[in-house]
Regions:
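Short, hinge-like loop/turn segments at secondary-structure boundaries
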Residues: 50-54, 108-110, 132-133
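Active-site phosphate/pyrophosphate- and oxyanion-stabilizing loops and adjacent acidic/basic residues
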Residues: 23, 79, 136
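Structural beta-alpha unit
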Residues: 1, 14, 79-114, 153-156
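A short acidic, glycine-rich active-site loop
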Residues: 55-72, 123-124
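General small-molecule cofactor/ligand-binding pocket signal
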Residues: 34-36, 90-94, 147-149
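Small/aliphatic-rich secondary-structure junction motif
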Residues: 1-59
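Glycine-rich, Arg-bearing micro-motifs that act as flexible, cationic patches
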Residues: 113-140, 155-156
Length: 156
């Protein structure tokens, strides 16, 4: 018997609500949670590979190449989920486009669901207008359910 997998997108500003929601669903389904942190300021050094793993280079050629990616917040959140919800949590750190990276991990792991947070903040609207939102990309390019967790504190 295989364990179902739920993929959740995370980044430095990911609301605890998104990770907690994904963890509660994983616990109810007795599923494993794969937390995917994607550095969209970097791209894979080998675009042919396209996995997002391994060597990466900055998207902006003027940036320093030796800047370490700080994933401590995601690792800390994953450790908290392991103890609070008592589920298996795997963390993957990738580079490139978040939507494509999440889709790739979901396909590679045969995930039953992808969980992402809604965009918020003043820059979110501009980013979505220029590049499209990760949630929208996933909803239009996935065969598995995509759950978009609202993260805005504002109520209508």
């Amino acid at each position: 018997m295989t364990t179902d997998i739920i993929v959740v997108g995370a980044h430095a500003r990911t609301a605890d609500t998104v990770l907690s929601t994904a963890a509660r669903i994983a616990a109810r389904l007795s599923a494993q949670l794969v937390v995917v942190w994607v550095d969209d300021s970097r791209v894979p050094a080998d675009p042919v590979d396209g996995s997002g793993r391994g060597a990466t280079v900055p998207l902006d050629p003027d940036e320093y190449d030796d800047v370490a990616v700080d994933t401590s917040a995601v690792e800390t959140a994953a450790a908290r989920l392991r103890t609070e919800v008592q589920i298996t949590v795997d963390v993957r750190v990738l580079a490139g486009d978040p939507g494509k990276a999440l889709a790739r991990v979901a396909a590679d792991t045969h995930a039953v669901m992808i969980v992402v947070g809604s965009s918020n903040g003043p820059a979110a609207g501009l980013k979505a207008a220029l590049h499209g939102s990760t949630a929208s990309f996933l909803m239009h390019h996935q065969l598995v359910p995509v759950l978009v967790v609202p993260v805005s504190k504002a109520r209508p």
